[in-house]
């Protein structure tokens, strides 16, 4: 069975333009009534990674939330907003990102995810005891509202990756530790979360996205697109098409195809891919490559074969958010110095993800630098 993805242009975040684009985008895939029924409790799951102002392009823009709340109510649904930020409380992140102002204006509740449970019918396909927030499981409908961004470990954060926020606070660190240095293992966790949550509708905020070393330290880039789909995986595949990269360049897509979840045939409605392709976009620094070497050799050559996080001393404000979040505790403060234990580091780049100053950089190993001279690492 084919799935559908709509592509609609939207020039900026003017509220009137956004609601028009949202209506058109969702109408193309069946209309809001297809996804929301009268009386349904509807969870709106934005990307609320960190408390940054909307122009930084770190979080889903408030106008997307406001327009979606309006459409859900028109269909008779009862919306509420929920997430579990990487740093700080939901209230703080929502205040700085402008989402709390929208929630207050629209009288839409904000719910922080802090009730982890293993679903009754089990956790994920691969990770059997994966815990999801109970609030997510109790919602009648989940509308996924990701931001189009790069991601240092996972290459891009789109529909599937955004659902990682359905895992409450400290449980996220446990997931990184379960996956260790294996980015594909982490992608399997993300696909497991997708299987459990099964969002009814995904709306991607690509009006202004993020390029470079995201998801927190990249640069805003106008893309001027809004994408909608009943299938997050299909939406993620179409974004790869728009960027001119192989669909399986995105590890979550690759894992989904391995598990027979991905769809080869997708109906694209509204704008045609060839007419709205992104001509210039900077991907994140390559974090690792599967060289096909025996395990013992890969471990011995770890620093050469992978990228590693490094501190930019002149920018660092010594807030120590990075040391607090590091899952394997491979990052410590010794006096004024930030010290990485690269033997313990699992290359999850959580430190880069939460640094408020952009003071964590990505340093490729010599083998990766050599490879990048001969091959574009973004196209596989």
Report each predicted region and the residues it spans.
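N-terminal and secondary-structure boundary signal
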Residues: 1-313, 317, 323-337, 342, ...
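Extended, alpha-helix-rich binding/interface surfaces that flank or overlap catalytic cores
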Residues: 346-347
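Helix-rich C-terminal "cap"/substrate-channel and partner-interaction subdomain
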Residues: 376
């Amino acid at each position: 069975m084919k799935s559908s993805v709509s592509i609609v242009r939207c020039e900026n975040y003017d509220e009137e333009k956004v609601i028009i684009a949202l209506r058109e985008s969702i109408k193309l895939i069946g209309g809001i009534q297809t996804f929301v029924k009268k009386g349904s409790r509807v969870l709106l799951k934005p990307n609320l990674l960190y408390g940054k102002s909307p122009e930084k392009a770190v979080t889903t823009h408030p106008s997307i939330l406001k327009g979606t709340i309006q459409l859900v109510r028109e269909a008779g649904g009862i919306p509420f907003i929920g997430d579990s930020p990487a740093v700080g409380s939901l209230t703080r992140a929502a205040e700085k990102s402008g989402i709390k102002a929208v929630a207050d204006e629209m009288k839409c509740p904000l719910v922080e995810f802090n009730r982890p449970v293993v679903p009754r019918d089990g956790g994920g396909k691969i990770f059997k005891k994966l815990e999801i927030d109970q609030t997510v499981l109790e919602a009648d409908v989940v509308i996924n509202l990701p931001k189009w961004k790069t991601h240092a470990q996972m290459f891009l954060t789109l529909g599937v990756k955004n659902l990682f926020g359905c895992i409450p606070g400290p449980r996220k660190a446990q997931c990184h530790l379960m996956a260790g240095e294996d980015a594909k293992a982490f992608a399997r966790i993300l696909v497991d979360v997708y299987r459990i949550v099964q969002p009814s509708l995904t709306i991607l905020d690509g009006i202004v996205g993020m390029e470079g070393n995201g998801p927190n330290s990249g640069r805003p880039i106008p893309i001027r697109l809004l994408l909608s789909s009943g299938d997050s995986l299909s939406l993620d595949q179409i974004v790869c098409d728009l960027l001119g990269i192989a669909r399986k360049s995105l590890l979550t897509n690759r894992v989904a195809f391995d598990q027979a979840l991905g769809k080869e045939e997708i109906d694209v409605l509204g704008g045609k891919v060839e007419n709205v392709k992104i001509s210039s976009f900077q991907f994140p620094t390559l974090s690792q490559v599967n060289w096909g070497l025996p395990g013992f050799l890969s471990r011995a050559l770890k620093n050469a074969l992978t990228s590693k996080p490094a501190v930019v001393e002149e920018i660092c404000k010594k807030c120590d958010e990075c040391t607090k979040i590091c899952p394997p505790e491979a990052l410590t403060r010794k006096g004024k110095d930030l010290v990485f234990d690269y033997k313990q580091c699992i290359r999850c780049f959580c430190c880069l993800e939460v640094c408020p100053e952009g003071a964590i950089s990505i340093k490729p190993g010599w083998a990766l630098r050599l490879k990048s001279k001969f091959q574009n690492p973004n196209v596989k």
